[in-house]
């Protein structure tokens, strides 16, 4: 028997048909839907007189456009002030009602960011193929699933046929061994990976994360890492199933139970790469060498340790990269060789599909407990990834820790990750952000994003500038 990678196994299990040109038809188990990339797909179904092939495979929730203040959320959809956002959220409600699709609506206690809701509800499970009209669908690969984003036309195709036309990707293994140091988090690990291989390093690959660091990592940490596989250029990221995976899934609302659970677990335990399986590329990193990371530029690969200085373009031999660095420094308002710890922040955002789960909230609360937000920080907000996360955090009293420190506690949503709702940066403002992208204008026109872990963001909120969280307390 030929040894297979985890990706090979997931692909083969869902292969419906393969053509001579290499294109294939893949069966899709779970389809997650939000308000931004679904309206045209529903219109397409309606115009063709079709219905979703498997309504029970679809789960919807609004996230990108929803407001996160209690004032706006108190009145449900009608309370949304932005007219475009209101239309998008209302349209999702109407479409789901018409086609009989399960939706966690804006004031449902289960509503949240699609990539948080899927795993925590058990709607996304090991061994599944999972798609959504959102590139960060790769998050779900942490469960030992094949998960990736699709375009709006593909959203319609999957609804109509339960299948997707695709080409098989190559296999890449990111192996991180050793032990992470104190204060080094999964977010730091994935930022360090991107810094090493670049934002195009994983292009054309399905990326498996392996090694001791990932075996020791919590499920929520793995979700953070797989979330940013797309920033490393890969379309999909994944981690092999182990006891951590199974313990995480057990008892969740949509997870199997009884005899079906036992059968499922037996199948899931096979979702590992076989010994001797071929990877087209292998990247090895020493986990002990990773330090808390801070992005300084306008690409996720423009990242260094908090101990370092802003890189000098003069030291970059590649003329294209040098030009990009010069542009990034100009946009970010930084100087070459400036210590990272000298960068002051105007706003702090703790949230997004990367870092808004309960472990992230706890880590941030631990840093700010008993302290006060710095006077120069105009705003610091904590936005839980779902109503479930919010309720858990409040049960633990974490919300009160933040509010006592002068940090706002918000309602679930994508929030300041992207400038599609009321939470935005002003031009020239620096933000310590736990999100996944630091492109020009990503958080608002002229906004300057610095990607960090929840603990590092929390420390910046208190200090007013970037500090090494390892020595902060």
UniProtKB/Swiss-Prot annotation:
Catalytic activity: (2R,3S)-3-isopropylmalate = (2S)-2-isopropylmalate
GO molecular function: 3-isopropylmalate dehydratase activity; 4 iron, 4 sulfur cluster binding; metal ion binding
Cofactor binding summary note: Binds 1 [4Fe-4S] cluster per subunit.
Gene3D superfamilies membership: Aconitase, domain 3 (3.30.499.10)
KW Metal-binding (keyword) present: yes
GO biological process, one term: L-leucine biosynthetic process
Cystines in this chain: none
Pfam family, one: Aconitase
Keyword Methyltransferase: no
UniProt-listed Enzyme Commission number(s): 4.2.1.33
Keywords: 4Fe-4S, Amino-acid biosynthesis, Branched-chain amino acid biosynthesis, Iron, Iron-sulfur, Leucine biosynthesis, Lyase, Metal-binding
PROSITE patterns in UniProt: ACONITASE_1, ACONITASE_2
Cofactor: [4Fe-4S] cluster
Binding site for [4Fe-4S] cluster: 353, 414, 417
Pathway: Amino-acid biosynthesis; L-leucine biosynthesis; L-leucine from 3-methyl-2-oxobutanoate: step 2/4
Role of this protein: Catalyzes the isomerization between 2-isopropylmalate and 3-isopropylmalate, via the formation of 2-isopropylmaleate.
Subunit structure: Heterodimer of LeuC and LeuD.
Family affiliation: Belongs to the aconitase/IPM isomerase family. LeuC type 1 subfamily.
UniProt-listed NCBIfam families: leuC, PRK05478.1, PRK12466.1
The name this protein goes by in its record: 3-isopropylmalate dehydratase large subunit
Organism annotation: Cellvibrio japonicus (strain Ueda107) (Pseudomonas fluorescens subsp. cellulosa)
Gene: leuC
